[in-house]
């Protein structure tokens, strides 16, 4: 069932109105102080803003192996990192308190899956702490699998699994071999399938637009501009106030039509 408060917060998030999105999620949390999802979504606002500022969610970043697999060169935003870490800690505290009496509570598991996936992304792409990222990826995989066993229609969980599988699958073979020894596996094609499921499913209640963007960027890496353009068209139409979606759509249009989007009738 849709939650109007959360829907409004996500709308603001995908319109890159980060401060307003944070406040919407914080207000939702104030009305439900025991819910771990509230601070998890505040953390999502912080990380999404950092990604947006650093250009992580662009084709230039995603198509550059040195950047995608090596992380950003600039220093992280100290305030956003502080807010993100605080929201992560609050989420974990509330989720563990819930699971002390309800070990397989789907809401707590969903919050933990989101947090672990976001921590993995933050460690890998922003802080360039790959070993810590691998630890978070293992947590993501564990929590997501438990969650899907309890609530199999929680298709938002496939985004975290898919992004992890895809990025690890893009690593050189020698790095993947080290991760296999550490219990972290990666599979590009499986990752694409998992992200595709989140991008297409009505049951991906909150992260479907983000999954569409990730699918578009992965599709460009896999030389499938038609799939990328389809996702970006839908995003640009649904969120006209987000300049990122329109810019990425303009970049991929000449790849397909052979003409600049500015010259198109």
What name fits each language-model region?
Residues 2-25, 32-34, 45-104, 110-153, ...:
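Short coil/linker segments at helix-helix boundaries
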Residues 40-41:
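N-terminal maturation segment of proteins
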Residues 210, 217-265:
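A cross-kingdom marker for long, charged
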């Amino acid at each position: 069932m849709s939650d109007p408060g959360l829907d409004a917060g996500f709308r603001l998030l995908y319109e890159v109105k980060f401060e307003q999105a944070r406040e919407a999620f914080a207000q939702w949390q104030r009305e439900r102080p025991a819910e771990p999802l509230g601070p998890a979504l505040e953390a999502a606002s912080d990380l999404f803003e950092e990604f947006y500022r650093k250009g992580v969610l662009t084709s230039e970043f995603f198509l550059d192996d040195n950047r995608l697999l090596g992380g950003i060169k600039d220093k992280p935003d100290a305030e956003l990192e502080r807010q993100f870490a605080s929201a992560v800690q609050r989420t974990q505290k509330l989720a563990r308190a819930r699971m002390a009496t309800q070990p397989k509570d789907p809401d707590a598991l969903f919050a933990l899956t989101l947090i672990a996936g976001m921590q993995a992304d933050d460690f890998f792409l922003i802080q360039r702490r790959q070993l810590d990222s691998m630890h978070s990826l293992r947590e993501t995989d564990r929590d997501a699998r438990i969650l899907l066993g309890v609530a199999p229609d929680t298709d938002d969980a496939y985004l975290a699994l898919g992004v992890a599988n895809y990025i690890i699958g893009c690593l050189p073979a020698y790095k993947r071999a080290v991760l296999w020894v550490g219990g972290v596996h990666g599979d590009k094609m499986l990752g694409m399938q998992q992200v595709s499921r989140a991008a297409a499913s009505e049951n991906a209640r909150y992260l479907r637009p983000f999954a569409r963007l990730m699918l578009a960027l992965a599709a460009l890496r896999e030389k499938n501009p038609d799939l990328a353009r389809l996702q970006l068209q839908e995003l640009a139409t649904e969120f006209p106030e987000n300049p990122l979606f329109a810019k990425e759509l303009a970049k991929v249009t000449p790849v397909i039509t052979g003409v600049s989007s500015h010259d198109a009738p």
